[in-house]
Design a protein with these regions (language model features):
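Conserved N-terminal beta-strand and adjoining loop/helix that marks the start
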Residues: 1-19, 41-43
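Short secondary-structure boundary/capping segments
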Residues: 2, 10, 26-28, 86, ...
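Residue-level signal for short segments within beta-strands and strand-turn junctions
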Residues: 12-14, 22, 97-100
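Conserved Nudix-box catalytic region and its N-terminal flanking loop in Nudix hydrolases
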Residues: 18-58, 153-165
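Unchanged
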Residues: 42-66, 77-135, 139-140, 161-165
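Low-complexity, intrinsically disordered Gly/Pro/Thr-rich segments
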Residues: 144-153
């Protein structure tokens, strides 16, 4: 089991909505039934920008405008995991925001990750999501400059505490 993972996540904005994925398609998915932004794991040799652009294109069909793509922060998830050698799983998530893109949104049937939907910002906290997402979404909305956020979760997925630097 790889207990240290690098990922990206992008909040793609159109009008007053974010493009979200309802993770309902994969069987063994730690994001199962949650609504999350678009992104995924790094492939060998990728930079954070390479990864987020590839993941967004693969999952949505959209091409992000590089000049408007904002690298907003790094979120470190530390999750207790009894199957990990040291009892912890750590994910470094490179967080992006973008409101300028080209292309046509693919049909949700063609997205392997889940159901794509534009969600009004005002409804974001009403959907099933990770509690820590509220913290970094708030930082994005407040236009906080580049930040580092550490989120500590227990094995059941409950947020224990967090630290913003």
């Amino acid at each position: 089991m790889n207990t240290l993972v690098n990922t990206t996540l992008c909040y793609i904005q159109k009008d007053d909505c974010y493009l979200m994925i309802h993770r309902v398609k994969k069987v063994n998915d730690y994001n199962k039934d949650k609504w999350i932004g678009v992104g995924g794991k790094f492939e060998n040799g990728e930079s954070p920008f390479d990864c987020v652009k590839r993941e967004v294109l693969e999952e949505t069909g959209l091409i992000l405008n590089e000049e408007k793509l904002e690298y907003r922060g790094i979120v470190t998830f530390v999750c207790k995991n009894s199957q990990a050698p040291d009892g912890l799983f750590t994910e470094f998530m490179h967080l992006f925001w973008c409101d300028d893109f080209d292309g046509t949104l693919i049909d949700s049937d063609d997205c392997n990750e889940g159901v794509l939907e534009w969600i009004p910002k005002s409804a974001m906290n009403d959907l099933p999501h990770w509690k820590g997402d509220e913290i970094f979404l708030d930082l994005i909305e407040k236009r906080v400059p580049f930040f580092s956020l550490k989120l500590n979760y227990d094995e059941e997925g409950n947020l224990l505490n967090y630290l913003i630097n």
